[in-house]
Amino acid sequence: MSHEAEEDLLEYSDNEQEVQVDNKATEVNAEGNGESQAKDSDKKGSYVGIHSTGFKDFLLKPELSRAIIDCGFEHPSEVQQHTIPQSIHGTDVLCQAKSGLGKTAVFVLSTLQQLDPVQGEVSVVVLCNARELAYQIRNEYLRFSKYMPDVKTAVFYGGTEYKNDIDLLSKKETVPHIIVATPGRLKALVRDKHIDLSHVKNFVIDECDKVLEELDMRRDVQDIFRATPRDKQVMMFSATLSQEIRPICRRFLQNPLEIFVDDEAKLTLHGLQQYYIKLNEKEKNRKLAQLLDDLEFNQVIIFVKSTVRANELTKLLNASNFPAITVHGHMKQEERIARYKAFKEFEKRICVSTDVFGRGIDIERINLAINYDMPNEADQYLHRVGRAGRFGTKGLAISMISSEDDEQVLAKIQERFDVKITEFPEEGVDPSTYLNT
């Protein structure tokens, strides 16, 4: 990192409590003596092993408990089990957990639990790197606050009419209590004094590594951060959190609880079958059609490396009687959201996308991810294939390898995540290995 970048960081305390959550760590903490646990429980960022049997053990507001039941959730995931008991009490959090384990629900439930809505005051700010992700997070807030009619939530991101945001924020009765936004748009609203963040109590960054690794976006975040009170809860979440980015995250945190679910080398998803297919570039279309014909799937997402390839492949699929839609960063925002919504609502089973859908997007029916083009780096592979097999369910990921560069990326993926990705068998794979019964 450059010296200039280091100087641009906020100077906050680096004092933190780190928790490595795996089976062994959980057992050790759960068996600690009562005296030490009682002592630690008063310390912000401390950790006591908790084995909750259900969401009811978190003693959430009745309105939240009803919404959770409506969603069909009974038992918290590992990351929820270890994080929610402290996050609902205002502890700062730095959390890394693999894709699909319910990180979003951690901060949505925690902030709603703490929220005491006051008309005209913004209490919660959630930042993320992608517009579709912001839209999705807003919908999660709507889902879990369905029995909290006084709570108002809004989403702000670039590519939409700035005046509409200003109009919403100009009237006390329409000012949202919860804001989900991309940094650029919210920075503009803060800069132009259209929004007052002086009452913010919870500040969340989802996909924090992606948000903070780019210097321009980090500076936007810092400007927004400075507009909020110093005394607030800060929570950060991501599926990948490199050793290099962690100190940058900690600059925003005060004595945080750090949760790392599983060793970083084991971040690939349980229940996700992963294969590769070696072939020439010109063979990809024929092989893709064969896979779509032969495999059983609910919905599939196909990743390509460019907007042009996304558009061309979608045309080809539709012409070949495979109804598909495409989503990429070069289309108008309204169109992107409309297509995302159509895919999520199962209007189409096939989506061709660039990496704009490679992070955080949660569509429950996706159980097949295909890398038509390989990503450039190992971490992006994890985020891509994590679209299948969400929340511990089964799924299938297939990567097409057509160059030496692809082979090098595949080798890095296997080394980085300590996983063996095998060649796709000629006879195919048993659907029971990747379909939930």
UniProtKB/Swiss-Prot annotation:
Pfam families associated with the record: DEAD, Helicase_C
Region (Disordered) residue spans: 1-45
GO-annotated cellular components: spliceosomal complex
Record GO biological process: mRNA processing; mRNA transport; RNA splicing
Chief place where the protein resides: nucleus
PROSITE patterns referenced in this protein's UniProt entry, alphabetically: HELICASE_ATP_BIND_1, HELICASE_CTER, Q_MOTIF
EC number: 3.6.4.13
Protein name: ATP-dependent RNA helicase SUB2
Taxonomic placement: Eukaryota, Fungi, Dikarya, Ascomycota, Saccharomycotina
